[in-house]
């Protein structure tokens, strides 16, 4: 599998906290950004298979939207244990956003990878979720992957944040009451882009929508048989929902593309009340509350980059 490697700009956590504090204040009424010890992510509401998001951090972008649109390329299937080896971190803890492994499921879905990959001494642990539209009533159907399936697949496209899964220092972000137009992730990403310019910074981690509701989408179970050639066509194909807090989100974002055809931000989420999907923005600016834990990435790995590309379907 072809792979390009890039070293991110890595400011100190303290500097990043200061930059994010300033930028988020333009978009939220109440903002507190600080450097803290990562909370134990094995506990509720996260229930991850590891305690933290620290140690040898990297971002992997695998495949891309051109393998889904305008028409699906069903040859593009991946394995998260193999991806961990490609990014030189066997045993990595991987979280993020991608397309579900249709090669196993038999249909298309939104995928929330949460995987402790295989290493020399440890068996892999799959804490992933997938979301699809319930054919019976049109509602979201969120399922824990390992309750039915035992592989570590994903497909088509994935934006992944990987680490050793260790405890350590992270950036805690609390933001309440949105006053600007940007969603939580876009605000952080654009703040970093404005501050660091041509020095790309990559970040990942997890955040909770503690209060409020969000606009979300779930892809149809059937891939489109007619070509989807614009954002408008894609939006007609997708199923949109409003979903309620608390939601556990898995963001991956990069301040600026270093010329590797990146999807600059991508966030999927799950919950313990049966809702999950692709995060767009909150729909309750007056009441929304976000609490997140983030770590900067040292390296970027661009895996199986599409040779033919386009700019739609990346929202």
Curated annotation (Swiss-Prot):
The keyword Secreted does not apply. GO terms for biological process: DNA damage response; regulation of DNA repair. It comes from the Eukaryota. Its cofactor is Zn(2+). InterPro entries: C11orf54_DUF1907. Pfam families: DUF1907 (PF08925). This is Ester hydrolase C11orf54 homolog. It comes from Mus musculus (Mouse).
């Amino acid at each position: 599998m072809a792979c390009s490697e890039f070293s991110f700009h890595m400011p100190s956590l303290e500097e990043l906290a200061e930059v994010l504090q300033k930028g988020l204040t333009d978009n939220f009424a109440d903002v507190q950004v600080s450097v803290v010890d990562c909370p134990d992510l094995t506990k509720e509401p996260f229930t991850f298979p590891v305690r933290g998001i620290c140690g040898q951090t990297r971002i992997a972008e695998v495949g891309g939207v051109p393998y889904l649109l305008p028409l699906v390329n069903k040859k593009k299937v991946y394995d998260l244990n193999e991806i961990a080896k490609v990014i030189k971190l066997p045993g990595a803890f991987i979280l993020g956003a991608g397309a579900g492994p249709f090669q196993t499921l038999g249909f298309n879905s939104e995928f929330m990878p949460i995987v402790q990959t295989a290493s020399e001494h440890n068996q892999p642990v799959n804490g992933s979720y997938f979301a699809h539209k319930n054919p019976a009533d049109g509602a979201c159907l969120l399922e824990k992957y390992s309750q039915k399936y035992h592989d570590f697949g994903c497909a088509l496209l994935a934006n992944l944040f990987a680490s050793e899964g260790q405890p350590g220092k992270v950036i805690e972000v609390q933001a309440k009451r949105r006053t600007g137009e940007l969603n939580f992730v876009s605000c952080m990403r654009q703040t970093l882009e404005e501050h660091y310019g041509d020095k790309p910074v990559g970040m990942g981690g997890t955040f909770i929508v503690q209060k409020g509701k969000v606009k979300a989408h779930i892809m149809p179970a059937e891939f489109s048989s007619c070509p989807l050639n614009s954002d408008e066509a894609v939006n007609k194909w997708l199923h949109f929902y409003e979903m309620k807090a608390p939601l556990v989100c898995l963001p991956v974002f990069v301040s600026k593309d270093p010329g590797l055809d990146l999807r600059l931000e991508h966030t999927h989420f799950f919950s313990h009340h049966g809702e999950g999907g692709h995060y767009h923005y909150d729909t309750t600016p007056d009441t929304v509350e976000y609490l997140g834990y983030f770590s900067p990435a040292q390296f970027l790995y661009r895996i199986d980059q599409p040779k033919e590309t386009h700019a739609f379907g990346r929202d």
